[in-house]
Amino acid sequence: RYGWHDSPFGDCLMVATDRGMCGLGFVLPEGREATAADLLARWDQARLVDDSSATAPYARRAFGDEGGPLNLVLRGTPFQLKVWEALMRIPAGSVVSYEKLAQHIGKPTAARAVAGAVALNPVSWVVPCHRVIRGTGISTGYRWGPARKRVLLALEAAQWEREGAAD
């Protein structure tokens, strides 16, 4: 099942199975059709049903409007899964380089392969690929657009500052 939803970062496409959310993407510059074709192509054997009522709970949980667990169903190579799991351990408000992420997963010479796995992350925002930058500190190569990446990082930094100030 899939459905379009509003998010703090613009329209997003959510994809879910009976076991959990397996895709989240933001509208590409080419529009909704291109976004849907790009994201839904990952499940070429699946019978896809447009059902935004079924994906709405995932959207609410992903963007903090509703509490509760957010079950993820990730499909990838063992290496990709390892990278995506490492992404979920990067604290909100923080960024790491591809090189540091490669070191973190025990593959210090695999920064390019890590970058490739980050780029194929099917669940944007929830698996926070936006928290990875070049070793030079430059924020580049975000599938959903560099402006959106800057907004995601700025929002997280602001939330982190607010929460830190409250302590």
PLM features: what roles do these ranges have?
Residues 1-109, 155-167:
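Basic nucleic-acid-binding alpha-helical/helix-turn surface characteristic of O6-alkylguanine DNA
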Residues 111-114:
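Helix-turn-helix DNA-binding helix
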Residues 120-122, 126:
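Major-groove DNA-recognition helix of helix-turn-helix-type DNA-binding domains
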Residues 129:
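Short cysteine clusters
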